[in-house]
Amino acid sequence: MENLEQLQERVAVSDGRAKADLVIKNGRIINVFSGEIMDGDIAIKNGYIAGIGNFPDAEKIIDAAGAFIAPGFIDAHVHVESAMVTPAEFARVLLPNGVTTIVTDPHEIANVAGEKGIEFMLEDAKGVPIDMFVMLPSSVPATEGEHNGETLHAEKLHPLYRHEKVIGLAEVMDFPSVAKGSSDILTKIIDAKKEGGRIDGHGAGLTSADLNNYLAVGIRTDHESTTAKEATDRLRAGMFVMLREGTVGRDLLQTIPAVSEKNSHRFCFCTDDKLINDLITEGSINYNIRLAIKNGIDPITAIQMATINAANCHNLPYLGAVAAGYQADIVFLTDIETVEISKVLKNGEVVVDNGVRHEAAFKQQAAVPFVSPPINHHVSLQDLALPLTKETCYVIGMQPNSLFTEKRIEQVAIQDGKFVPTVENDLLKMAVVERHHDTGCVGLGIVKGFGLTEGAIATTVAHDSHNIVAVGISDEAMKAAIDHITQTGGGIAVVNGAGQVLHDLALPIAGLLSDKSYEEVENDLAGLLNAFKQISTADGFDPFLTLSFLTLPVIPELKLTDQGLFDFATFQIISNEVN
């Protein structure tokens, strides 16, 4: 927050009575308000833009040499935990991609560690040259009846609004509770309104009629559109629509046709969940911009969606524009069509130059201490047996690069009254093992799409309750993978048919985050993918994040929790057998 002296200094620079800290000359300024490209010097004082015009003198001058000057990009909705690195490491990845602000929902770590998890994320982001705004998790757990690590009722969330980086209530996923007027979720919404915060939606699978419930209680955004029609329905209802392009949720190409010249001001971009290897190879919001431009969106419109629209969506009045009074978060683009980034400024300081981070901009701070709750279960081979009396069963049909699944009906193999996975039909066993309270709960189901020929994979990243999820050919291989990630304090493992670990990634922070650099995490993810290729014929999707979302019951159609097979249409646990 600025003080009186800083504001007076900025005014003095704006009218020419004092020198700017920095002036950027010879840039082509993208005006996100008018849609024009303008000329002019950009004068910066104390991290804010003092004015645009003729500013001949400054402590430092940068010659933009004809580069386009855009505001810093904003990711309107992201879960940092999906990158499996700490917020400080996450910032190191994002800044070269022009992302200077993120709006995050830390509900992954909150599901494991409650308020302490949220506080850890806020503390770790201190001193990092990126703005990490937090929307408080609304649905921990995501649905009633799941066993997660902690439950966050309204009275636990409310004190967290005192933190300056907390700006609202995150995606309201439990739609049935909204529809029936549950006092806990409505109290959370009222508290957010009292604090002046936005309320995010999570309208996966909702019809235009269902949206009335959302709008009636004050939910104003949504990032779950997977078609242009869904995006249009949300737009017409009065929502800001975030177009998502992540690792699994790749929806931008299907939703971008909804954007027009008349309505583009109500659209912005998000990644939601994106792995570190995809952030490195593709990018972040810069990738969304590039993809939108390739598919017919005007470059300036795409940049507006990534900047001022996102700022307006979240009521961040000093972000999202290159204009007087705005924070000096600036991206230099050598090519507006391909979004080639040459330089990034955060609060008026150069943090990236010619694609290289200025590591000095990252204040060296000691690792934030975090005591992870123990992984607590006692699963046995007997617990992994799936008894069946009928060969006709419901099967979770995994859909590559989608958060949705298909509710399939298949004929499955049975031996001695138990389900037997079959390689030729790609019908595999899936298990969710409760890991927080040693309840002994194990949900079992059948999944199609992973193409395993031997072995198993397992992970403690299992949205949103983050129990252990495994898929495999044999119970022995599944148990070997589960046992390994239990011993390492959480993580991901690939094992072969003999139960030998081919590769793993330890995630000691809540079973969700690594304590290593993002470069080391990227190397381990590459090792995991190579190991997966040794035991599977499937390709073209990330198997680990895909598996992690097969446990999220608030997205259609069929998911698996520690309670059993969950049918989104009825919002109930159902039998594996078709009656």
From Swiss-Prot:
Protein name listed in UniProt: Adenine deaminase
Presence of keyword Magnesium: no
Molecular function terms from GO: adenine deaminase activity
Required cofactor(s): Mn(2+)
Cross-referenced Pfam families: Adenine_deam_C, Amidohydro_1
SUPFAM superfamilies referenced in this protein's UniProt entry, alphabetically: Composite domain of metallo-dependent hydrolases, Metallo-dependent hydrolases
UniProt keyword annotations, A-Z: Hydrolase, Manganese
Keyword Manganese listed: yes
NCBIfam families in the record: ade
Source organism superkingdom: Bacteria
Catalysed conversion reaction: adenine + H2O + H(+) = hypoxanthine + NH4(+)
EC number per UniProt: 3.5.4.2
GO BP, sorted A to Z: adenine catabolic process
Family annotation (Gene3D superfamilies): Metal-dependent hydrolases, Urease, subunit C, domain 1
Membrane-spanning residues: none
EC category: hydrolase
Family: Belongs to the metallo-dependent hydrolases superfamily. Adenine deaminase family.
